[in-house]
Design a protein with these regions (language model features):
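Phosphate- and other anionic-substrate recognition elements at nucleic-acid/protein interfaces
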Residues: 1-120
C-alpha cells in the first residue's frame, strides 16, 4: 500500500510518498516552499500562498497514486499567527483530499514517536 505523508506548514510543507509493503521505502518526497509577498496585504498574500500550496499538492495527486493521506494533526500553541497559517495549509490539504476522493488520517506527533520508538 502506498500513502502520502504530509507535514503541514505555510512557509514549508513536507511530503513523502511511502510504500508500506513488507519492505517499506520512500518512493518520492520533497518540500513545498512559499515566500511572503511583502508588497501585498497580509490577507492577499495568505490567499496567494494557499494557492501555491494547492497547486503543488494537486500536482502530487496527478503524478502519483496512493491509498490515503496521513498528515500531522493541527496542534495549538501560544503563537496565534503561526497556528492560523498552519490551519490554512490544513484547509488546503482537507479540501484537495475531498476533491480528489482520498481519505485523510490525522496523526499526533507524540503518537508517531511512540509507535516508532516505544517511548512517550
Amino acid at each position: 500500500m502506498v500513502i502520502l505523508g504530509l507535514d503541514p506548514g505555510f512557509a514549508s510543507l513536507g511530503w513523502a510518498l511511502l510504500d508500506c509493503s513488507a519492505q517499506p521505502r520512500c518512493l518520492a518526497g520533497g518540500v513545498i516552499r512559499t515566500k511572503p509577498d511583502r508588497t501585498a496585504a497580509r490577507c492577499d498574500d495568505n490567499v496567494s500562498r494557499c494557492g501555491e500550496i494547492a497547486d503543488a499538492i494537486q500536482q502530487i495527486y496527478k503524478e502519483h497514486r496512493f491509498a490515503f493521506v496521513a498528515a500531522e494533526a493541527q496542534s495549538w500553541t501560544r503563537h496565534a499567527n503561526a497556528d492560523r497559517a498552519v490551519a490554512q495549509a490544513w484547509g488546503v490539504i482537507a479540501a484537495l483530499s475531498e476533491v480528489n476522493g482520498c481519505p485523510v488520517i490525522q496523526l499526533r506527533p507524540q503518537d508517531v514517536k511512540h509507535e516508532l520508538t516505544g517511548s512517550r
